[in-house]
Amino acid sequence: MRVVFMGSPDFSVPVLEALHAHHEVVCVYCQPPRPAGRGKKDRPTPVQARAEELGLPVRHPKSLRTPEVQADFAALGAEVAVVVAYGLILPQPILDAPDRGCLNIHASLLPRWRGAAPIHRAILAGDDETGICIMQMEAGLDTGPVLMCEKTHIGAEDTVQDLHDRLSGMGARLILGAIEALDDLVPQPQPEEGVTYAEKIAKAEAGIDWSRPAAEIDRQIRGLSPFPGAWTMLGGERVKLLRCRLAEGQGAPGELLEGLVIACGSGAVEITLAQREGKRPMERDEFLRGFALPRGSLATAS
Protein backbone atom coordinates (compact mmCIF):
# COMPACT_ATOMS: atom_id res chain seq x y z
CA MET A 1 0.00 0.00 0.00
CA ARG A 2 1.18 3.57 -0.72
CA VAL A 3 1.76 5.14 2.70
CA VAL A 4 2.68 8.62 3.89
CA PHE A 5 4.36 8.44 7.30
CA MET A 6 4.14 11.33 9.77
CA GLY A 7 6.18 11.19 12.98
CA SER A 8 9.17 12.78 14.67
CA PRO A 9 10.69 11.28 17.89
CA ASP A 10 12.36 7.96 18.74
CA PHE A 11 8.96 6.45 19.53
CA SER A 12 7.99 6.73 15.85
CA VAL A 13 11.10 5.10 14.35
CA PRO A 14 10.13 1.39 14.75
CA VAL A 15 6.81 2.18 13.07
CA LEU A 16 8.58 3.78 10.10
CA GLU A 17 10.89 0.78 9.81
CA ALA A 18 7.96 -1.67 9.87
CA LEU A 19 6.06 0.26 7.22
CA HIS A 20 9.15 0.53 5.02
CA ALA A 21 9.65 -3.23 5.23
CA HIS A 22 6.07 -4.12 4.24
CA HIS A 23 4.66 -1.19 2.24
CA GLU A 24 5.64 1.60 -0.13
CA VAL A 25 6.43 4.67 1.98
CA VAL A 26 6.08 7.48 -0.58
CA CYS A 27 7.08 10.31 1.77
CA VAL A 28 7.99 11.00 5.39
CA TYR A 29 6.77 14.11 7.22
CA CYS A 30 8.45 15.16 10.45
CA GLN A 31 9.34 18.20 12.53
CA PRO A 32 12.16 20.36 11.12
CA PRO A 33 15.71 20.17 12.52
CA ARG A 34 16.18 22.22 15.68
CA PRO A 35 19.22 23.45 17.64
CA ALA A 36 20.44 20.85 20.13
CA GLY A 37 23.51 19.90 22.12
CA ARG A 38 26.26 22.12 23.46
CA GLY A 39 26.98 23.68 20.08
CA LYS A 40 23.29 24.37 19.46
CA LYS A 41 23.64 23.09 15.91
CA ASP A 42 20.52 22.09 14.01
CA ARG A 43 19.84 18.41 14.61
CA PRO A 44 17.31 16.38 12.61
CA THR A 45 14.60 14.42 14.38
CA PRO A 46 15.21 10.69 14.87
CA VAL A 47 12.59 10.01 12.19
CA GLN A 48 14.31 12.25 9.64
CA ALA A 49 17.68 10.66 10.36
CA ARG A 50 16.29 7.14 9.91
CA ALA A 51 14.26 8.05 6.82
CA GLU A 52 17.35 9.44 5.13
CA GLU A 53 19.27 6.25 5.98
CA LEU A 54 16.47 4.30 4.27
CA GLY A 55 16.57 6.58 1.23
CA LEU A 56 13.06 7.93 1.77
CA PRO A 57 12.00 11.46 0.76
CA VAL A 58 11.51 13.75 3.77
CA ARG A 59 9.46 16.91 4.21
CA HIS A 60 9.28 19.04 7.33
CA PRO A 61 6.89 21.96 6.77
CA LYS A 62 6.39 24.32 9.69
CA SER A 63 2.64 24.20 9.07
CA LEU A 64 0.17 22.01 7.19
CA ARG A 65 -2.35 24.82 6.76
CA THR A 66 -1.07 26.49 3.58
CA PRO A 67 -2.71 25.59 0.24
CA GLU A 68 0.71 24.80 -1.26
CA VAL A 69 1.60 22.26 1.44
CA GLN A 70 -1.85 20.67 1.23
CA ALA A 71 -1.62 20.40 -2.57
CA ASP A 72 1.82 18.78 -2.33
CA PHE A 73 0.48 16.30 0.22
CA ALA A 74 -2.52 15.38 -1.94
CA ALA A 75 -0.29 14.96 -5.01
CA LEU A 76 1.55 12.10 -3.31
CA GLY A 77 -1.43 9.88 -4.07
CA ALA A 78 -1.23 8.04 -0.75
CA GLU A 79 -3.74 5.33 0.03
CA VAL A 80 -3.29 5.89 3.77
CA ALA A 81 -1.33 8.15 6.12
CA VAL A 82 0.09 6.77 9.37
CA VAL A 83 0.63 9.33 12.13
CA VAL A 84 2.52 8.74 15.37
CA ALA A 85 3.83 11.55 17.60
CA TYR A 86 4.15 13.90 14.63
CA GLY A 87 3.83 17.21 16.45
CA LEU A 88 1.44 19.16 14.19
CA ILE A 89 -2.35 19.20 14.06
CA LEU A 90 -3.67 17.82 10.77
CA PRO A 91 -6.24 20.16 9.14
CA GLN A 92 -9.23 18.67 7.33
CA PRO A 93 -7.74 18.85 3.79
CA ILE A 94 -4.81 16.70 4.99
CA LEU A 95 -7.13 14.26 6.77
CA ASP A 96 -9.23 13.93 3.59
CA ALA A 97 -6.37 13.50 1.11
CA PRO A 98 -5.44 9.78 1.46
CA ASP A 99 -7.97 7.36 -0.04
CA ARG A 100 -8.28 5.41 3.24
CA GLY A 101 -7.81 8.39 5.55
CA CYS A 102 -5.25 8.92 8.31
CA LEU A 103 -4.51 6.36 11.02
CA ASN A 104 -3.03 7.45 14.33
CA ILE A 105 -1.05 5.27 16.74
CA HIS A 106 -1.80 6.52 20.25
CA ALA A 107 -0.03 5.26 23.39
CA SER A 108 -2.99 4.92 25.73
CA LEU A 109 -6.27 3.08 26.15
CA LEU A 110 -8.56 5.73 24.69
CA PRO A 111 -10.51 7.71 25.77
CA ARG A 112 -8.20 7.73 28.80
CA TRP A 113 -5.17 9.97 28.34
CA ARG A 114 -5.90 11.79 25.14
CA GLY A 115 -3.18 14.32 24.39
CA ALA A 116 0.56 14.89 24.54
CA ALA A 117 1.97 12.81 27.43
CA PRO A 118 -0.09 9.62 27.84
CA ILE A 119 2.77 7.37 29.00
CA HIS A 120 3.91 9.80 31.70
CA ARG A 121 0.37 10.40 32.92
CA ALA A 122 -0.52 6.72 33.14
CA ILE A 123 2.39 6.04 35.51
CA LEU A 124 1.90 9.25 37.50
CA ALA A 125 -1.76 8.37 38.05
CA GLY A 126 -0.93 4.85 39.24
CA ASP A 127 -2.71 3.09 36.36
CA ASP A 128 -2.33 -0.70 36.30
CA GLU A 129 -2.40 -0.93 32.52
CA THR A 130 -1.97 1.06 29.35
CA GLY A 131 -1.71 0.14 25.69
CA ILE A 132 -1.85 1.14 22.05
CA CYS A 133 -4.90 2.26 20.10
CA ILE A 134 -5.02 2.49 16.31
CA MET A 135 -7.46 5.31 15.62
CA GLN A 136 -9.11 6.73 12.49
CA MET A 137 -8.20 10.38 12.74
CA GLU A 138 -10.70 13.23 12.75
CA ALA A 139 -10.48 16.93 13.58
CA GLY A 140 -10.75 16.55 17.39
CA LEU A 141 -7.79 15.79 19.68
CA ASP A 142 -7.54 11.98 19.78
CA THR A 143 -11.32 11.68 19.47
CA GLY A 144 -11.59 9.41 16.42
CA PRO A 145 -13.06 5.91 16.35
CA VAL A 146 -10.75 3.07 17.36
CA LEU A 147 -9.91 0.32 14.87
CA MET A 148 -7.63 -1.84 17.01
CA CYS A 149 -6.39 -1.85 20.60
CA GLU A 150 -3.96 -3.88 22.70
CA LYS A 151 -3.26 -3.65 26.44
CA THR A 152 -0.08 -4.07 28.46
CA HIS A 153 0.46 -4.26 32.23
CA ILE A 154 2.35 -1.45 33.97
CA GLY A 155 4.85 -3.15 36.27
CA ALA A 156 5.72 -1.93 39.77
CA GLU A 157 9.13 -0.68 38.61
CA ASP A 158 8.29 0.36 35.04
CA THR A 159 9.52 3.80 33.99
CA VAL A 160 8.42 5.97 31.09
CA GLN A 161 11.40 4.63 29.13
CA ASP A 162 10.34 1.03 29.74
CA LEU A 163 6.79 1.65 28.55
CA HIS A 164 7.98 3.87 25.68
CA ASP A 165 10.08 1.04 24.26
CA ARG A 166 7.41 -1.61 24.79
CA LEU A 167 4.58 0.47 23.32
CA SER A 168 6.66 1.62 20.36
CA GLY A 169 7.23 -1.96 19.27
CA MET A 170 3.60 -2.81 19.93
CA GLY A 171 2.46 0.10 17.78
CA ALA A 172 4.67 -1.02 14.89
CA ARG A 173 3.18 -4.50 15.04
CA LEU A 174 -0.42 -3.35 15.39
CA ILE A 175 -0.34 -0.84 12.53
CA LEU A 176 0.75 -3.57 10.12
CA GLY A 177 -2.19 -5.68 11.25
CA ALA A 178 -4.58 -2.75 10.99
CA ILE A 179 -3.54 -1.90 7.43
CA GLU A 180 -3.78 -5.54 6.36
CA ALA A 181 -7.29 -5.84 7.84
CA LEU A 182 -8.48 -2.34 6.93
CA ASP A 183 -11.36 -3.61 4.79
CA ASP A 184 -12.70 -5.76 7.62
CA LEU A 185 -12.17 -3.57 10.68
CA VAL A 186 -15.23 -1.79 12.09
CA PRO A 187 -14.39 1.59 13.68
CA GLN A 188 -15.64 1.72 17.27
CA PRO A 189 -16.64 5.19 18.55
CA GLN A 190 -14.89 6.12 21.77
CA PRO A 191 -17.14 6.06 24.85
CA GLU A 192 -18.15 9.42 26.27
CA GLU A 193 -17.33 8.25 29.80
CA GLY A 194 -13.79 8.01 31.10
CA VAL A 195 -12.25 10.80 29.05
CA THR A 196 -9.02 12.20 30.55
CA TYR A 197 -6.36 14.47 29.07
CA ALA A 198 -2.60 13.91 29.25
CA GLU A 199 -1.26 17.44 29.60
CA LYS A 200 2.37 18.13 28.73
CA ILE A 201 4.75 17.63 31.63
CA ALA A 202 5.69 20.91 33.32
CA LYS A 203 9.13 21.48 34.84
CA ALA A 204 7.47 22.30 38.16
CA GLU A 205 6.29 18.68 38.42
CA ALA A 206 9.86 17.35 38.64
CA GLY A 207 10.88 18.61 42.10
CA ILE A 208 10.27 16.02 44.84
CA ASP A 209 8.39 16.93 48.01
CA TRP A 210 9.50 14.26 50.48
CA SER A 211 6.56 14.92 52.80
CA ARG A 212 4.30 13.09 50.36
CA PRO A 213 3.57 9.34 50.68
CA ALA A 214 6.14 6.92 49.28
CA ALA A 215 3.68 5.53 46.72
CA GLU A 216 3.24 8.99 45.18
CA ILE A 217 6.97 9.72 45.09
CA ASP A 218 7.63 6.29 43.56
CA ARG A 219 5.19 7.11 40.75
CA GLN A 220 6.70 10.57 40.32
CA ILE A 221 10.21 9.18 39.87
CA ARG A 222 9.15 6.43 37.46
CA GLY A 223 6.66 8.68 35.64
CA LEU A 224 9.27 11.34 34.85
CA SER A 225 12.16 9.04 33.91
CA PRO A 226 14.24 9.66 31.91
CA PHE A 227 12.78 13.05 30.95
CA PRO A 228 12.51 15.53 32.53
CA GLY A 229 13.73 13.48 35.50
CA ALA A 230 12.45 13.90 39.06
CA TRP A 231 15.08 15.67 41.15
CA THR A 232 16.09 16.45 44.70
CA MET A 233 18.88 18.32 46.45
CA LEU A 234 21.22 15.77 48.03
CA GLY A 235 24.70 16.33 49.46
CA GLY A 236 24.63 19.91 48.23
CA GLU A 237 23.92 18.90 44.63
CA ARG A 238 20.87 18.63 42.43
CA VAL A 239 20.44 14.94 41.68
CA LYS A 240 18.05 13.30 39.23
CA LEU A 241 16.39 10.13 40.50
CA LEU A 242 15.66 7.82 37.56
CA ARG A 243 14.70 4.42 38.99
CA CYS A 244 13.36 3.33 42.35
CA ARG A 245 11.29 0.83 44.27
CA LEU A 246 9.14 1.02 47.37
CA ALA A 247 11.09 0.15 50.52
CA GLU A 248 10.66 -0.46 54.24
CA GLY A 249 11.73 2.24 56.66
CA GLN A 250 10.63 5.25 58.66
CA GLY A 251 12.24 8.59 59.34
CA ALA A 252 11.91 12.30 58.82
CA PRO A 253 10.78 13.17 55.27
CA GLY A 254 13.87 13.20 53.04
CA GLU A 255 16.10 11.42 55.57
CA LEU A 256 18.66 9.02 54.12
CA LEU A 257 18.07 5.81 56.08
CA GLU A 258 20.52 3.33 54.57
CA GLY A 259 22.26 3.22 51.21
CA LEU A 260 19.87 5.17 48.98
CA VAL A 261 16.71 4.41 50.95
CA ILE A 262 14.99 7.74 51.59
CA ALA A 263 12.14 8.29 54.05
CA CYS A 264 8.95 9.88 52.79
CA GLY A 265 5.90 11.35 54.54
CA SER A 266 4.84 7.74 54.97
CA GLY A 267 7.00 4.79 53.96
CA ALA A 268 10.23 5.02 51.99
CA VAL A 269 11.68 4.57 48.51
CA GLU A 270 14.99 3.02 47.49
CA ILE A 271 16.75 4.78 44.61
CA THR A 272 18.33 2.30 42.19
CA LEU A 273 19.47 4.69 39.42
CA ALA A 274 20.55 8.30 39.95
CA GLN A 275 22.39 11.03 38.07
CA ARG A 276 24.48 13.88 39.43
CA GLU A 277 24.71 17.10 37.41
CA GLY A 278 27.18 16.74 34.57
CA LYS A 279 27.51 12.99 35.13
CA ARG A 280 26.01 9.93 33.48
CA PRO A 281 23.27 7.92 35.21
CA MET A 282 24.68 5.40 37.71
CA GLU A 283 23.34 2.32 39.47
CA ARG A 284 22.98 2.67 43.24
CA ASP A 285 26.27 1.05 44.33
CA GLU A 286 28.40 2.90 41.78
CA PHE A 287 26.66 6.17 42.66
CA LEU A 288 27.41 5.74 46.37
CA ARG A 289 31.06 4.85 45.74
CA GLY A 290 31.64 8.24 44.16
CA PHE A 291 29.39 10.33 46.39
CA ALA A 292 29.82 10.21 50.17
CA LEU A 293 26.39 10.45 51.77
CA PRO A 294 26.36 9.71 55.51
CA ARG A 295 23.30 8.11 57.04
CA GLY A 296 20.91 10.81 58.21
CA SER A 297 21.68 13.15 55.30
CA LEU A 298 18.61 15.01 54.08
CA ALA A 299 17.19 15.13 50.58
CA THR A 300 15.34 18.41 50.14
CA ALA A 301 13.26 20.25 47.55
CA SER A 302 15.66 23.21 47.39
Curated annotation (Swiss-Prot):
What broad class of enzyme is this?
A: transferase
Which keywords does this Swiss-Prot/TrEMBL entry list? Protein biosynthesis, Transferase
Molecular function per GO: methionyl-tRNA formyltransferase activity
A cellular component term, taken from the record's GO annotations: cytosol
InterPro entries in the cross-refs:
Fmt, Formyl_trans_C, Formyl_transf_N, Formyl_transf_N_sf, Formyl_transferase-like_C_sf, GART_AS, Met-tRNA-FMT_C, Met-tRNA-FMT_N
UniProt EC number: 2.1.2.9
User: Which Pfam families does the record associate with it?
Assistant: Formyl_trans_C, Formyl_trans_N
Q: Which NCBIfam families match?
A: fmt
What job does the chain carry out?
Attaches a formyl group to the free amino group of methionyl-tRNA(fMet). The formyl group appears to play a dual role in the initiator identity of N-formylmethionyl-tRNA by promoting its recognition by IF2 and preventing the misappropriation of this tRNA by the elongation apparatus.
Entry's family note:
Belongs to the Fmt family.
**Stored HAMAP family:** Formyl_trans
- Protein name stated in the entry: Methionyl-tRNA formyltransferase
Q: Which organism is it from?
A: Cereibacter sphaeroides (strain ATCC 17025 / ATH 2.4.3) (Rhodobacter sphaeroides)
The primary gene name is: fmt
